[in-house]
């Protein structure tokens, strides 16, 4: 990690031999009961068990067929498709503007990031320049949702390893952020905020101050979660050195986002190909060294810290101004114009009935979502609806790598590994 | 066609009256007990699951209704909460889970996808889980706010209180046509 936090700190009062006393278990080996010289093997038989799809640890939508020898996973097959909702096909049946609700429900833990990703793709195709303030608002809401996403992951991961308190704290912090999002865009979870050419509405009165207060509270809760988990013996024993992926393997498997960075590759699209206003903001990209579940957890904690920093900077930098382009071929005209002028009525009618006319062509646009690279491949034939829309879901390569990551480990290691890759049904199944 | 016997008063003996009275008492007390000890099986598939997490957490705390304590085994649960979209591949699994639950059991459809398919009007999605299992309470919203779900739980509790409960139910168990294993 970039900062010496977590298990690295040495506490003289810690139990000798524990991670807190600065004695890390040897790296690079999977420690098992069977490794010692007192190993007394029990006769174990080969068996195939079926985990899920309706199993709490498989998040309800993944089926894993695991071939076990005793407790060791020999082979695993994943069966997905239990949440296939026809995302790409549905998007081709509606106008460009009506795609937004579908994108909300891709990664439903951080919906605004999907909104922004799609809006950027369409704007790239239409060569639209969006107003400054809209860019800042998009970054602010995206980063708020990144914090929500990571809080959910950390909470759920801890809960599935037995730490209910962390889950309750995480959800409490997420709820505070959701309240602010509800004030901003009317929905708690599927917050539909980005529009083609800008954002839906400006911040309400006093929203900035409220959000800053909430962020302070979230920082406090996050620190508390860190105190509960970072040196927690149970948590460390189950996460450290389990589900390891080397840097080469991670690149080979197509990892992006926190999972790739946990393996040591400092690749972040916000730095590599900055979009919106990320090039003007000062923030760090945390990088892990071990590529195991514990690093992926620490990565999430550090990214929340960085997102917090980004939001505060945005609030300082942003200036009043337009929040959506004033081009009525793309954005709905303001209501006084709709009710008062014939041009306004016509623009409104055309946009609602036919949708915006995006110039013919195709484009691939990618953003850094909470899980990694969220890519939209958009093809337009010049009509009011997408001709073809393809999605590169960030969670998919990590899920596909799960059999590789868990081969040879214990069955119980499957749970933290599955949690730390943050598999979200909505985006993986599309 | 009305027969002349129709107008005659129904004669109930005092024994039957007493039995009915006692059965009513038993039914009421069983209903009271059952409505405050709902054990949920959360069948969580999609977005609504995030709201389910909130509802089960500290702020909304569904446990305070004596209800909705999550059980991750269908055999220990009597309220099936179907949270999120159910598609054609998932449908037989949902049906299997419902069949595995012990009687008496109730079902809540959490969110519009479970209630009606929501805006996923396409080949993949089941247009409402009531096409495959019976549903007692529908909670609208995409996703519903936790308050709406709590409202749904209270509605269900009212419904359970007013149902007739028996200590020993000798009725044959309902059979779902075309279910797995038949």
From Swiss-Prot, chain A:
EC number in record: 7.1.1.-
Catalyzed reactions: a quinone + NADH + 5 H(+)(in) = a quinol + NAD(+) + 4 H(+)(out)
UniProt GO MF annotations: NAD binding; NADH:ubiquinone reductase (non-electrogenic) activity; quinone binding
Major location category of this protein: membrane
GO cellular component, one term: plasma membrane
Membrane topology according to the record: Peripheral membrane protein
Pfam name, any one: Complex1_49kDa
Record-linked Gene3D superfamilies: Cytochrome-c3 Hydrogenase, chain B
Keyword DNA-binding appears in the UniProt entry: no
InterPro entries: NADH_Q_OxRdtase_suD (IPR001135), NDH1_su_D/H (IPR022885), NiFe-Hase_large (IPR029014)
UniProt superkingdom: Bacteria
Keywords attached to this entry: Cell inner membrane, Cell membrane, Membrane, NAD, Quinone, Translocase, Transport, Ubiquinone
Region annotation (Disordered) ranges: 1-36
Subcellular localization: Cell inner membrane
PANTHER family with a match to the protein in the record: NADH DEHYDROGENASE [UBIQUINONE] IRON-SULFUR PROTEIN 2, MITOCHONDRIAL, NADH-UBIQUINONE OXIDOREDUCTASE 49 KDA SUBUNIT
Subunit structure: NDH-1 is composed of 14 different subunits. Subunits NuoB, C, D, E, F, and G constitute the peripheral sector of the complex.
Family recorded in the similarity comment: Belongs to the complex I 49 kDa subunit family.
Protein purpose: NDH-1 shuttles electrons from NADH, via FMN and iron-sulfur (Fe-S) centers, to quinones in the respiratory chain. The immediate electron acceptor for the enzyme in this species is believed to be ubiquinone. Couples the redox reaction to proton translocation (for every two electrons transferred, four hydrogen ions are translocated across the cytoplasmic membrane), and thus conserves the redox energy in a proton gradient.
Protein name: NADH-quinone oxidoreductase subunit D 1
UniProtKB/Swiss-Prot annotation, chain B:
Binding, [4Fe-4S] cluster: 47-48, 113, 142
Primary role: NDH-1 shuttles electrons from NADH, via FMN and iron-sulfur (Fe-S) centers, to quinones in the respiratory chain. Couples the redox reaction to proton translocation (for every two electrons transferred, four hydrogen ions are translocated across the cytoplasmic membrane), and thus conserves the redox energy in a proton gradient.
Top-rank taxon: Bacteria
Name used for this protein in its record: NADH-quinone oxidoreductase subunit B 1
Cofactor(s) the record lists: [4Fe-4S] cluster
Keywords: 4Fe-4S, Cell inner membrane, Cell membrane, Iron, Iron-sulfur, Membrane, Metal-binding, NAD, Quinone, Translocase, Transport, Ubiquinone
Keyword Membrane: yes
Organism: Anaeromyxobacter dehalogenans (strain 2CP-C)
Family (UniProt): Belongs to the complex I 20 kDa subunit family.
Class of this enzyme: translocase
